[in-house]
Regions:
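Conserved, mostly hydrophobic/aromatic
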Residues: 40, 44, 77, 140
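Active-site glycine-rich loop that binds ribose-phosphate moieties when present
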Residues: 26-45
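Active-site mouth loops of central-metabolism enzymes
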Residues: 14-32, 109-123
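C-terminal helical cap(s) of enzyme catalytic domains, especially alpha/beta-barrels
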Residues: 148-164
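Active-site beta-loop-alpha junctions enriched in small/polar residues
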Residues: 18-24, 53-54, 78-82, 110, ...
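Short, small-residue-biased leader/transition segments that mark boundaries at the very start
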Residues: 1-7
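Catalytic-face loop-and-helix region of soluble metabolic enzyme cores
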Residues: 78-135
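A structural motif corresponding to the C-terminal end of an alpha-helix
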Residues: 8-13, 43, 128-139
Length: 164
């Protein structure tokens, strides 16, 4: 954290840090994780970008807890458009991210149908962005995993276009 302050002293940098709506896997508790985020913000971070999540309510509760803890930077939600559910489940298991039962049901039976999986994943991501937008969220971070085409299509469908 000390080196971040050095960087900001030298130039006009924006500093983004990681945040975990469903708690970092190595954190001792949700409160300890929140205090760690506060420490990073107090050290000069301009914004926090969250780990991906699939439960919008977990993000909204986390955002409320951040406000209550005096964290006054934008908490940008991390959105993971899912095209491969098995891979997403593996990522979720490693990162303490809960996959809602409804989501698992939506991908059930699609192991051999990549195109339908992409459509389902894009639809879920679009619904998340729409709900979060209604809750006042203005900026989003898409985890593309080097496959930007799904995120591009999602943004296009939501009205975000180059040059706008």
């Amino acid at each position: 954290v000390g080196s971040e302050m050095c960087i900001r002293d030298r130039a006009d940098f924006d500093i983004s840090v990681a945040a975990y709506p469903e708690v970092h896997p190595e954190a001792k508790s949700a409160q300890a994780d929140l205090l760690n985020l506060k420490r990073k913000v107090d050290a000069g971070a301009n914004r926090a970008i969250t780990q991906f999540f699939f439960d919008v309510e977990s993000y909204l509760r986390f955002r409320d807890r951040c406000v209550s803890a005096g964290i006054d930077v934008e908490i940008i939600p991390g959105i993971l458009p899912v095209s491969n559910f098995k891979q997403a489940k593996k990522f979720a298991d490693m990162t303490n991210v809960r996959i809602p039962a409804w989501m698992a049901q939506m991908f059930d039976g699609l192991d051999d149908d990549a195109e339908t999986r992409k459509l389902v994943g894009a639809n879920i991501a679009m619904d998340m962005v729409k709900i979060l937008s209604r809750e006042g969220v203005k900026d989003f971070h898409f985890y593309t995993l080097n496959r930007a085409e799904m995120s591009y299509a999602i943004c296009h469908t939501l009205g975000v276009r180059p040059g706008l």
